[in-house]
């Protein structure tokens, strides 16, 4: 009694006719006709609802330009909680029937999202770039999160925590939320031209998430945690004959799933942290601000980012 889209990397063409590649962005109009007892959420705000005896038609406003793999909607028998924020009304769609668990978690969910949004706005000097932000909690979702602009999906159990969660579980949830919020800028506002640069959006979202969350958990040794979580897994692959570069060529989008793995998620963060340390924090931030402004609502490659960063350092990037 619910359904959702998950179109990354090349499945949008199973929903509507399109060229399924990230550098062909478009603004989408979406209309859904669903059973009367269902609700629906999508990338853009709801424009109007048309009721009939047997169904409900949801007409959504036009989206900002987005890549096809980021187009999203979910509908079904979801419960909805809503709260006004400085970013407009923020709704949480969830399925869990444990009202006590939901009530224990809901304020933290709102707070973590608004904190992350505010931090990203301050760091990038770019206001939240989409029309609204809703949260969709899906049981048994394939990933911990997916950064659809305006409608972030999460695995429900990763966000609605049980009982009295440990500090480590609270840190993991905060980091997950910060990661997906960071993607609204790195990945959604500016998207890779092709999936050979998919690592770029992932590594920036991870870097930003650490910057957002780590000060909130001062009892952790975050540098030690970074070393222990990334270096062993990066070396375990990098020392083998089957190691691959961080940036890999991709001839066929059907093989995009092969790009994900320990090299992207564990070696790439080490390389990017070294780049930030070598350039200096301020120069690195200045470069990222210029990168996001230059390619806003468009696409960029690693080479185009390097062209922006290179003049800001004495290093020969």
List where the protein language model places each region.
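Acidic/His-enriched low-complexity segments
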Residues: 1-131, 260-262, 277-279, 295, ...
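Hydrophobic alpha-helical and helix-loop surface patches within well-folded domains
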Residues: 60, 92-317
């Amino acid at each position: 009694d619910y359904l959702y889209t998950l179109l990354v990397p090349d499945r949008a063409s199973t929903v509507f006719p399109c060229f399924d590649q990230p550098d062909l962005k478009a603004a989408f109009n979406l209309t859904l006709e669903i059973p009367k007892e269902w609700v629906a959420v999508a990338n853009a705000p709801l424009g109007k609802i048309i009721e009939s005896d047997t169904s409900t038609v949801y007409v959504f406003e036009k989206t900002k330009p987005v890549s096809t793999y980021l187009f999203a909607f979910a509908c079904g028998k979801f419960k909805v909680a809503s709260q006004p924020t400085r970013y407009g009304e923020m709704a949480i769609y969830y399925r869990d029937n444990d009202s006590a668990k939901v009530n224990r978690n809901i304020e933290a969910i709102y707070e973590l999202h608004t904190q992350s949004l505010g931090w990203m706005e301050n760091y990038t000097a770019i206001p939240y770039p989409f029309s609204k932000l809703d949260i969709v909690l899906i049981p048994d979702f394939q990933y911990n999160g997916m950064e659809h602009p305006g409608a972030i999906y999460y695995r429900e159990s990763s966000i609605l925590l049980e009982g009295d969660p440990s500090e480590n579980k609270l840190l993991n949830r905060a980091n997950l939320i910060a990661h997906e919020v960071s993607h609204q800028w790195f990945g959604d506002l500016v998207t890779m031209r092709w999936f050979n640069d998919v690592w770029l959006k992932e590594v920036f979202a991870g870097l930003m998430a650490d910057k957002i969350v780590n000060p909130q958990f001062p009892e952790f040794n975050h540098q030690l945690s970074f070393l222990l979580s990334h270096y062993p897994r990066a070396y375990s692959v990098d020392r083998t004959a089957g190691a691959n570069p961080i940036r890999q060529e991709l001839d066929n989008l059907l093989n995009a799933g092969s790009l994900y793995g320990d090299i992207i998620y564990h070696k790439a963060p080490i390389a990017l942290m070294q780049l930030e340390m070598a350039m200096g924090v301020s120069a690195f931030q200045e470069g990222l601000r210029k990168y996001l402004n230059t390619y806003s609502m468009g696409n960029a490659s690693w080479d185009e980012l390097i062209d922006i960063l290179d003049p800001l350092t004495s290093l020969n990037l």
